[in-house]
Amino acid sequence: MNCCDFSHSRRRLVLGAGGSFCAAFLAGTSAAADTPEDRLRELLTDRRSLKLLRGDEQLEATYWTANGGYNRDQYLNICWLLRDMQADRVFPMNHGLLDVLCGVQTWLARTGIDAPLRIHSGYRTSKTNQRTEGAALDSRHIVGRAVDISVTGVSNVRLAGMASVLGRGGTGLYPGRNFVHVDTGNERIWIDRPRKKA
């Protein structure tokens, strides 16, 4: 399968933003990984860990292992870091979302980038979401199924592309802003163009 020959328009949108980025973006996964589930399965090892950074807080946590399943304490540590910081509220984050983040981080590591995912936003209460500029009223942030992330030294286009082809939900690319939105749910992608001032 040609790396740019995706049947879904959502993938074409992200890849179209990058041109020659396509080959580099798919480096680190095998040619046999043709479907999003295949790609994610290939990237998720017997030990699923996340390296996260949010402000002054840093966390490296192994939330799942093949022989032990989910590690409750490490999972709760991740949920704490992804809390609504304005409301100081913690919420159980979606396991599938953590797997997508782990897949992206593993993929980056296989291409020589060993950097934490910088968290810009995780869980949001409805009140915080209402105060967040441009947030959808039914945002997946309010149900623990979305994060906004960036990685030092990685373009947002590349990061969005990686999250998109893992196929677990939505990916939002915001040109001119410093993060990529990743969520679990319906597969879709959007590029939010900066609004012109009148």
What label would you give each PLM region?
Residues 1-24:
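N-terminal secretory signal peptides and thylakoid transit peptides that target proteins
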Residues 17, 42, 48-51, 137-198:
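Catalytic cores and adjacent binding grooves of peptidoglycan-active enzymes
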Residues 66-118:
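Active-site acidic/histidine clusters and adjacent loop/turn architecture
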Residues 127-140:
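Charged, often glycine-rich, active-site loop that binds/positions anionic groups
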Residues 100-111, 126, 152, 162-169:
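Structured segments of extracytoplasmic/periplasmic soluble domains
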Residues 25-60:
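C-terminal segment of N-terminal export signals and the immediately downstream linker at the start
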Residues 111-122, 170-174:
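Surface-exposed patches in mature extracellular/periplasmic domains of secreted proteins
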